[in-house]
Amino acid sequence: MILLVRFAPAADAELLAVIARIGADSPSAAVAFRDKALHALSRLRDFPDSGRTLPEYPALPVREVIAAPYRFFYQVKVDAVWIVAVWQGAQLADPPEDWVSRKR
């Protein structure tokens, strides 16, 4: 089954902020990163479980895809794969309590 890959509003805002930060220094690098990220995420349409479980929080029902240096956290739902958060790879923090419940 082919699933849609969708962004929760918070994750969409996080991605747009990343692209804006990169674009402030180099617009072409921002476009290249956006394309790299979307390409990495596109595999989830056909292989939604292909991302790895989070090494820091293996009990969470969340997986990740890496588009270096960013980590895209997602959940597989019946209707779609939902990107729920975007973190810079060096970020170490407690998991947001709302990851599992972020609404589309």
Where are the language model's segments positioned?
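A general secondary-structure boundary signal
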Residues: 15-19, 60, 64-66, 80-82
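A short, surface-exposed loop/turn module that caps and links secondary-structure elements
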Residues: 39-67
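Short, hydrophobic secondary-structure boundary micro-motifs
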Residues: 31-32, 52-56, 95
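Arg/Lys-rich, positively charged N-terminal/basic patches that mediate binding to nucleic acids
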Residues: 1-36
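Enriched for short, Lys/Arg-rich terminal
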Residues: 67-71, 75-104
